[in-house]
Amino acid sequence: KAVMDELIPLAQSRPDIKAYVAPYSGTFYYRNISGTKLLSAHSFGIAIDLVYNRKDYWKWASREEGQKRLESYPKEIVEIFEKNNFIWGGKWGHFDLFHFEYRPEIIMMSRFFGNRNNEPQFWYNGAPVDNDEVKSYIKKIDETFENL
């Protein structure tokens, strides 16, 4: 909801952004990741595909075509999604430019743990643990590992 609250008005005021946003290609869709037996993030309702172009996906385009499209992709869209804990398929080696996944644990790890040294410490050392949202992510991750 937070993404759309920001993205929709931007797309309404900027035709160049709207061309990448609407009509979107899909969200919840129970299916396997192409070529695997693993469920797609779409199966869990945590992914959205925006407008697609055949040059947006690694299986449909050459690396050069994908790179050219990547360079033209509106940074504003990516920033809005990342600010709200989504990862972007445009940053993957097997690129998927129109794909965004809600993955707060990955975003949190990249924000706070990119420059760690080898000293023993809590896995979340360096994160703003006084923030309630961060605390809830830490708790959820810890509980998941306790139940393995």
Cite the ranges covered by each PLM segment.
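Conserved beta-strand edge residues that scaffold enzyme active sites
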Residues: 94-96
